[in-house]
UniProtKB/Swiss-Prot annotation:
Functional note: Pump for glutathione S-conjugates.
Keyword ATP-binding set for record: yes
Gene: ABCC9
SMART domains listed in its UniProt record: AAA (SM00382)
Entry protein name: ABC transporter C family member 9
Residue sites binding ATP 2 per the record: 1289-1296
Transmembrane spans: 37-57, 84-104, 116-136, 150-170, 179-199, 315-335, 350-370, 427-447, 452-472, 541-561, 567-587, 934-956, 976-996, 1048-1068, 1167-1187, 1191-1211
GO biological process terms held by the UniProt record: response to nematode
Tissue distribution: Ubiquitous.
Homology family: Belongs to the ABC transporter superfamily. ABCC family. Conjugate transporter (TC 3.A.1.208) subfamily.
Any one Pfam family match given in the protein's UniProt record, by short name: ABC_membrane
Binding site for ATP 1: 665-672
Length: 1506
């Protein structure tokens, strides 16, 4: 019925093929194209010479080089690239000259029937290659670094011409090869080498100077050149020859070392200069600026900048990818010819068979070389882009305005740096699929058309339909990806904030509440992940089933059209369908990567366009041109520019050089904002700010960097011992240094966590002093230090070493005001009063309220003192003796005492990493997490069934299809195709089952691992957080967890799938010719050897890469926290340089991991080609009849993919092992030693405990770690219930440690603490901490609202909350905001002043109403008036309760019932204030006298004491 139509189709197809062959054969197409090309080339060359002669063009840099060469005697060391180009050019020239000679003697038969065309073509070729050879020789004389662009273009065109014609004629020829064929083959191989040289472009010359040093001849700026040389000299890749780069043998020395012993960080070589972060960042910055100038802001400018940055390297990668895609289809193209040869072996020459085998092998080798180069090139480009993006995200973070900073938390920005950048660089790897996809599809369709005629159209339509299905799926996937990233941002933001404030959570017993908050955010992320993976599983099912669907549709169409399905045609089609799997499989990954990178790129583009600090906010003048250091005229400033009420308004300020200006005022009056206006940190709405001179800034909340104390003080400046000693002495740090383990080289933990508040404050004051600035801005510098230290700082630092400097200092301590040349009184964002101390007292419009509150406090001290004994005025000698006495009591709270100096104790340990092979227990832990590993055998069974059904369907088609068009099929085509379709459908269903099981198992495992790690971290003791940088934990929670969520299950699955596939392939090949096993076994042994040789090096490099990623994030988090200080000290460039160094430290192992993978893949591919070539030669050599040609063709079909499969197996195993490091790292944090249980069921206290509030310490000793000395020593005392106990002592005497012991933040190493007859070590931590109240030294607010911060457990009514707010003096401030209780609190409470934050913390304890309240410097950051009000409120609200107060303000503790004086971690005194004051020699008595003397000394008059 369909026969006529089918016959017509077959005839039409045959005619098309014949016409194409005639066009190439009978007409002299090659010769004519060749002549045109040579003439064009020669014309261009002559024009170029003429233009050069007349001086129109000039070789870039050549004259400069020649001038340099005249100055010194230099010889050129030749390179492999140059030698191969010269050899190949001369070889091709010789070949054409010899052919020309034979043509003269009529000794050669040409394919072209026109002798004129043949002769003209050879003459033009000879002339062209003569020119080329001469130019190549001249290159050496002129010492050119790169081959001229015209020469490289010529080599490229020659290869295309040779490959297009010669390769086809040689492989299609059935007769024995002649001289012309061998000449063409020689030319083709030489052109291939020249193509490689032209792509690289470099001659590879080195200059050999007379001194004997060898260095590359590079043109351009010499300074830049020196930088390049320093990188290149130690970079094996930078110094590698062309051959070493092709074979990746430049990395051999690293493998040799890694095989002998585990690699260390210093063993990894440097990267090439073009891969260095500095080079990449600078290049990308240029592109950003150029694009922004041309196109303006918007997301498009970011995309265009990236495109401009990557296009050159991406274009080279694209050339390799296109050649790779083209050569991959030569195998399927030749299969039909090979089956025909085997079927008609008697009538054909064996040479033809061997030539076909050589064609197969050559195509596979070219495919391997180009594939390895484009994959490596893509990874290298990804590395460069990652370095550029990370550095720009970092640089942007240093200049974000306050509004932008509030809208982007550090957790979000860390996500940009870790996750989003990774997704963009991953897309660079996938982008080459865009060029390869059309080539692969149309190459496949061409081969199918050649063998199946118009049936190929059915294949094309089906392929396009399958690909079209991806569009709606991709749009849906993009939405899911966007949801995943938003959910991940929310989780990381919360995690980052919790880690920073973990101490507060533990003190307040809120850890469970915030643990549940993270779990809720993770549940949201989990739901998004499950939707994405479920869709991905369905997409995979469609695309894995696609080749089977396409083949069924194509074969059915052929049957209906009457196209004969011979064995050769079917096998060629099956091989082509197999090749089509690559673009179809790759499409969802490409689209997924495209979607993910688009979402990530939009996020980064949006971030890079956020507003920055105003560059013109401050005018900087020279000191010589003005006597004013700071001047503000008619200034208005606001943290929220859109707000109707500015933060500061009507600011007029003139500060002369050398003046001391004090700024005071109530909490939230704008004192810190005034300093920010001088720094240019706050948005300027109007007015002028002028500053003349270098600035130094000390923020209210100490910002301390991880590192040594000396590093923090020097802050990038050179160490000058005399200046340094002077600074340290002025900042009262000498005694602390003596008592630190390593003096000023003692290492500080993250955010100075192992330092007391006073020590951190003095270290950052020393940092400012050492900079020798002209203007000093000190924000409440005395709040965290005791009375004696405060006086010492004021006298020796502010009035001593800084006496000639301009100093603006914010303070709540009135005793430091009289010495100021100018006092500014702030109120509601305005300067209400300005003048000297005496002038302001006389004005009676506000200042006297602050002074009055201080007077009251001082009066209370004096009255108690006088009632105890007669107060005597202290002389200067008394003052000196008191100071001397106080000095003897100094110690360091958190550090090692003098007797332990010799013992090194590093607080922040280097990140723990495993060594050697990843343990089996890690794999087992991962595989057996979900249902004890029950899903694993089902997944393997599903894949095995898929593979068996695939082989069965292909075997069925090869066995049943007739060997020739004339043969009769064994069964009807309808039945053949029905069985084939059923087998194909079965295999697709197996894929669906497998993908769903992998998605379920992988995500469930990831969720279990996350839950375990999260609970382990939350239950870790504070010592873990003290010694572990936040970035280290965040790295595991973001990057490593992302690997488990989306990659790990797929990578492990692919290990099993690829092994099953290769076993199936070997089975089919051994069925065809069992002799293949003879060669396969030793090759398999070689593969295993290579894999084992590779693994130790790659594993350690991967671990290093993972470890080196955390410092980038940690450094970034620290820099964001101290961005204001960095800008104030003008240290941006230094911090950016540190960031670039850290990026390079990560890039080094990462680059060598990528190189190592390519090294392995290249060698494994070559070994698999060896097996394939052996099997082909075996099939050609075996006598006819020994083997069925159709089955032999099936073996070749499977053999074509052997190299890919073999490389895939090893690649997947290595990749899975590298990814398994993330599992290993998460497991490490799932086994952190836990602190005591939250609840102990058998030992739960009564509901009303503690009802009395008595606290008994018995022989208490506390140390921070086993190798650290005791910080508290033999503390034995009792705090009676319902009493007020004051705890005093010099900075670092152990006061805060006592409180930490009370809350069991640190466990006693000896002794007990008993509260109301309950030993606190016997009850659960939650039962203990939830019954105690505390206002900590560092006030912490969480991202959210005021309501959430006051009542995070949602236990109280609005009425109760408002009552607490009014009591803690925040009622008016909060009512003034539109949102009231829902007023926004940003990360760290940055939009509230430090004093307001402390008042919110007070509100918490007023709500909690505990019977025991601890105040740890609770009012250090509020003014005296507010402090007085707060003390009254506490006395009223906690009248019959136990209140333990730590304070540096003596008046805060003078009215206590009992005072505990700590010194050197021991109890110095413990009695009532009155009794202690009766003893002249008591420590407390001396503290009181010191405070009185200080106030009296600085008042300068009796006004203060009246």
């Amino acid at each position: 019925m369909f026969k006529p139509f089918g016959f017509a189709a077959e005839t039409g197809s045959h005619l098309l093929t014949t016409q194409w062959l005639q066009l190439g054969n009978s007409l002299c197409l090659k010769e004519r194209i060749s002549i045109a090309m040579q003439v064009t080339f020669l014309a261009f060359f002559l024009i170029h010479l003429a233009l050069k002669w007349f001086g129109v063009v000039r070789n870039r840099g050549s004259n400069d080089v020649e001038e340099d060469l005249k100055k010194q005697s230099i010889t050129v060391k030749q390179s492999f690239s140059y030698n191969i180009s010269l050899l190949c050019s001369v070889s091709i020239l010789g070949t054409h000259c010899f052919i020309l000679l034979l043509l003269f003697r009529d000794s050669v038969v040409s394919r072209c029937d026109s002798s004129v065309s043949v002769f003209s073509a050879e003459v033009s070729q000879s002339f062209s290659w003569l020119f080329v050879s001469v130019v190549v020789v001249k290159i050496r004389e002129r010492r050119l670094v790169k081959f001229p662009w015209m020469l490289r273009s010529w080599w490229l065109c020659s290869f295309i011409l040779s490959f297009s014609f010669d390769a086809h004629f040689i492989t299609a020829k059935h007769e024995p090869l002649e001289f012309q064929d061998y000449a063409d083959l020689t030319g083709l191989l030489a052109s291939l080498f020249l193509l490689a040289v032209s792509i690289r472009g470099k001659t590879g010359f080195h200059l050999l100077e007379s001194s004997g040093n060898t260095e590359p001849l590079l043109l351009g700026d010499q300074t830049e050149q020196n930088k390049k040389d320093s990188y290149s000299s130690s970079s094996p890749y930078g110094n590698a020859t062309l051959f070493q780069r092709i074979t990746f043998s430049w990395i051999n020395p690293l493998f040799s070392l890694g095989y002998k012993r585990p690699l260390e960080k210093d063993d990894v070589p440097d990267i090439d200069v073009k891969d260095s972060a500095r080079f990449c960042s600078h290049a990308f910055d240029q592109k950003l600026k150029t694009t922004k100038e041309k196109e303006g802001p918007g997301n498009a400018f970011f995309y265009n900048s990236v495109l401009r940055y990557v296009w050159r390297k991406a274009a080279i990668n694209a050339v390799f990818a296109v050649v790779n895609a083209s050569t991959a289809y030569i195998g399927p193209y030749l299969i039909n010819d090979f089956v025909e040869f085997l079927s008609e072996k008697q009538s054909q020459s064996l040479n033809h068979g061997y030539l076909l085998a050589l064609g197969f092998l050559t195509a596979k080798i070219v495919e391997t070389v180009t594939q390895r180069q484009w994959i490596f090139g893509a990874r290298q480009l990804g590395l460069r882009l990652r370095a550029a993006l990370i550095s720009h995200i970092y640089q942007k973070g240093l200049v974000l305005s306050s509004q932008s900073r509030q809208s982007h938390t550090s957790g979000e920005i860390i996500n940009y740096m870790s996750v989003d950048v990774q997704r963009i660089t991953d897309f660079i790897w996938y982008v080459n699929n865009i060029w390869m996809l059309p080539i692969q599809i149309f190459s496949a369709i061409y081969i199918l058309q050649k063998h199946l005629g118009l049936g190929a159209l059915a294949a094309l339509v089906t392929t396009l339909m399958v690909m079209a299905c991806n569009y709606p799926l991709t749009r849906l996937q993009r939405n899911y990806q966007s949801d995943i990233m938003n959910a991940k941002d929310d989780r990381m933001k919360a995690t980052s904030e919790i880690l920073k404030n973990m101490k507060i959570l533990k003190l307040q017993a809120w850890d469970n509440q915030f643990l549940n908050k993270v779990k809720t955010l993770r549940k949201k992320e989990y739901d998004c992940l499950w939707k994405s993976l479920r869709l991905q599983a369905f997409t995979t099912f469609i695309l894995w089933g696609a080749p089977s669907l396409i083949s069924v549709v194509t074969f059915v169409t052929c049957m209906l059209m009457g196209v004969k399905l011979t064995a050769g045609a079917v096998l060629s089609a099956l091989a082509t369908f197999q090749m089509l799997q690559s673009p179809i499989f790759g499409l969802p990954d490409l689209l997924s990567a495209l979607v993910q990178s688009k979402v990530s790129a939009d996020r980064i583009a949006s971030y890079l366009q956020q507003s920055e600090t105003q560059k013109d906010a401050v005018e900087y003048c020279s000191k010589d041109h003005t006597e004013l250091s700071v001047e503000i005229e008619n200034g208005a400033f606001s943290w929220e520019p859109e707000s109707s009420r500015p933060t500061l308004d009507d600011i007029e300020l003139k500060v002369k050089s050398g003046m001391k200006v004090a700024v005071c005022g109530a909490v939230g009056s704008g004192k810190s904002s005034l300093l920010s206006s001088i720094l240019g940190e706050i948005q300027k709405l109007k007015g002028t700010v002028r500053v003349s001179g270098k600035q130094a800034y000390v923020p209210q909340s100490p910002w301390i960097l991880s590192g040594t104390i000396r590093d923090n003080i020097l802050f990038g400046s050179m160490y000058e011992s005399e200046k340094y000693e002077r600074t340290v002495k002025a900042c009262a740090l000498i005694k602390d240094f003596e008592l630190f383990s390593n003096g000023d080289l003692t290492e500080i933990g993250e955010r100075g966590i192992n330092m007391s508040g006073g020590q951190k404050q003095r270290i950052q004051i020393a940092r400012a002093v050492y900079q020798n600035a002209d203007i000093y801005l000190l924000d409440d510098p005395f709040s965290a230090v005791d009375a004696h230290t405060g006086r010492e700082l004021f006298e020796d630092c502010l009035m001593g070493i800084l006496k000639d400097k301009t100093v603006l200092y914010v303070t709540h301590q009135v005793e430091f005001l009289p010495a100021a040349d100018l006092i500014l009184v702030m109120q509601n964002g305005r300067v209400m009063q300005a003048g000297k101390f005496e002038e302001l007292l006389k004005q009676n419009i506000g200042f006297e309220v602050l002074v009055g509150a201080h007077n009251e406090a001082l009066d209370s001290i004096l009255s108690i003192e006088k009632s105890s004994r007669n107060f005597k005025e202290g002389s200067k000698d008394d003052t000196a003796s008191i100071a001397e006495s106080l000095q003897t009591h100094c110690d360091s709270e958190h550090n090692i005492s003098t007797e332990n100096k010799k013992k090194e104790a590093k607080l922040v340990q280097d990140e723990e990493t495993e060594k050697g092979v990843i343990g089996k227990e890690v794999y087992l832990a991962y595989l057996t997490t979900v249902k004890g590993g029950l899903l694993v055998p089902f997944i393997i069974l599903a894949q095995s069934c898929f593979q068996m059904l695939q082989i069965a369907s292909n075997y069925w088609m090869a066995w049943t299809a007739p060997p020739t068009a004339e043969s009769i099929p064994k069964l009807g085509m309808g039945r053949i195709l029905l069985v084939y379709a059923l087998l194909a459908a079965g295999s697709s269903l197996c894929v669906l089952a497998r993908t769903i099981l992998v998605a379920i198992g992988g995500l469930s495992t990831a969720e279990t691992f996350f839950s375990r790690m999260l609970c382990s971290i939350f239950r870790a003791p504070m010592s873990f957080f003290d010694s572990t940088p936040t970035g280290r934990i965040l790295n595991r929670a973001s990057t490593d967890q992302s690997v488990l969520d989306l990659e790990m299950a797929v990578k492990l699955g692919w290990c099993a799938f690829s092994i099953i596939q290769i076993v199936g392939t070997i089975f089919v090949m051994s069925q065809v010719a069992w002799q293949v096993c003879v060669i396969f076994i030793p090759v398999a042994v070689a593969c295993v050897f290579y894999q084992r040789y590779y693994t130790p090096t790659a594993r350690e490099l991967s671990r290093m890469s993972g470890v080196e990623r955390a410092p980038i994030l940690h450094h970034f988090a620290e820099s964001l926290a101290g961005a204001t200080t960095i800008r104030a000290f003008d240290q941006r460039d230094r911090f950016i340089s540190s960031n670039l160094v850290l990026i390079d430290s990560h890039s080094r192992p990462w680059f060598h991991v990528a190189s190592a993978m390519e090294w392995l893949s290249f060698r494994l591919n070559l070994l698999s080609h060896f097996v394939f070539a052996f099997s082909l030669v075996l099939l050609v050599t075996l006598p006819e009849g020994v083997i069925n040609p159709s089955i032999a063709g099936l073996g070749v079909t499977y053999g074509l993919s052997l190299n890919v499969l073999q490389a895939t197996v090893i690649w997947n195993i290595c990749n899975a092992e590298n990814k398994m490091i993330s599992v290993e790292r998460i497991l490490q944090y799932s086994k952190i030693p836990s602190e005591a249980p939250l609840v102990i069921d058998g030992h739960r206290p009564l509901d009303n405990w503690p009802n009395v509030g008595s606290i008994v310490f018995r022989d208490l000793q506390v140390r921070y770690a086993e190798h650290f000395p005791a910080v508290l020593k033999n503390i034995t005392c009792e705090f009676p219930g319902g009493k007020k106990i004051g705890v005093v002592g010099r900075t670092g005497s152990g006061k805060s440690t006592l409180i930490q012991a009370l809350f069991r933040i640190v466990e006693p190493s000896q002794g007990t603490i008993v509260i109301d007859n309950v030993d606190i070590t016997k009850i659960g931590l939650h039962d203990l901490r939830s019954r105690l109240g505390i206002i900590p030294q560092d006030p912490a607010l969480f991202d959210g609202t005021i309501r959430l911060n006051l009542d995070p457990l949602a236990q109280y009514t609005d009425h109760e909350i408002w009552e607490a707010i009014d009591k803690c003096q925040l009622g008016d401030v909060i009512r003034a905001k539109d949102e009231r209780l829902d007023a926004t609190v940003v990360e760290n409470g940055e939009n509230w002043s430090v004093g307001q934050r402390q008042l919110v913390c007070l509100g918490r304890v007023l709500l909690k109403k505990s019977n025991i309240l601890v105040l740890d410097e609770a009012t250090a950051s509020v003014d005296s008036a507010t402090d007085g009000v707060i003390q009254k409120i506490i006395n009223q609200e906690f009248k019959d309760r136990t209140v333990v107060t730590i304070a540096h303000r003596i008046h805060t503790v003078i009215e206590s019932d009992l005072v505990l004086v700590l010194s050197d971690g021991r109890i110095a005194e413990f009695d009532s204030p009155a009794k202690l004051l009766q003893r002249e020699d008591s420590f407390f008595s001396k503290l009181i006298k010191e405070y009185s003397l200080r106030s009296n000394h600085f008042a300068g008059s009796n006004d203060l004491l009246s």
